[in-house]
């Protein structure tokens, strides 16, 4: 069946549905009869020589049924566990498999059909996608995926990405198995999370920042209170003591919005040991200055090309709050309270073409008399695919004291950094 043939049959079927007053979601039996009648009509015209006949009419009926009542050309992709991301650009659909290979969809689709699927996914949420809200993000499929969609006039055509959340439970140990961390680095980070340190995870899009943040949360002791705030819920690590909070867009009348900054501000009054922000992008960073000043631990992700860039990006985000606080003050607050920056990178695996995600360095901030941040690499990987090694450096004295308080008497921090002793 050609793409043009499918789209013509689908157009006729939709016209019949509209004219019949049929509710496709409630009367499946009548819908199937209508779709089969539409396909039979097309076949009769084909036998008269007006067009090419369908090789498998039953398959066409099933495809139409999926388009009208389910998720159309995306249905099979959304049902697969090995698909990480789906990219929709007009009538084109590509997807990223778990191994990192990008493939094209071999099922015919059109922009109108793809948009109908996207709108159907968003309709099940409290978000909107229309002329007044041409950019939308939503947690879809019972929270198992995130949809980001843009439509004209903001974009030339429908442009959407569906990101599936990893079904596996990320832990620091699993990151060791994947080659992103060494045992020494994982043990050190586990120790850091038990001591309520403030950690930033940085990297480009797709580097695995959210998965890494999940692994850090999983290492937090169960008696610590964790408050996790996100624009769109992506983290799903079980929290024994604490909760997750999700921002809310404005309603149709423009009211009811709950921003990420408001959520972070609210959690400060809830006695957190650790505040988690899924992704820092704007004014919520200013509220984090209050959090770290209050002695709370912090864990967040931020887009950046290096660990030093991540610190600058955090300051710039805090200044976006418009509180007229001098930049030097913001830098001083973050410089004296952030403990670690973990930078991740991604590239294409040379052997099989899959995506490789690895930790490039773990840096500790050190006290500085200047406005600029000062940091020291504790673990470093010179290149993607190379070994992640302890540099021999130790964290600043204040952090060492906090970490060693959490260690059993027979183990010291040097042994942990060397990977010679777990704790």
What are the functions of these language-model segments?
Residues 1-130, 137-140:
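N-terminal accessory targeting/assembly segments
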Residues 80, 96-195:
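P-loop NTP-binding catalytic core
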Residues 199, 215-335, 345:
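Switch/coupling sub-region of P-loop NTPases
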Residues 204-206:
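The conserved Walker
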Residues 209:
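Conserved lysine of the Walker
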Residues 287-290, 333-361, 367:
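Helical/strand "switch-coupling" subdomains that flank nucleotide/phosphate-binding cores, especially
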Residues 351-423:
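NTP-binding/hydrolysis catalytic cores, primarily Walker-type P-loop NTPases
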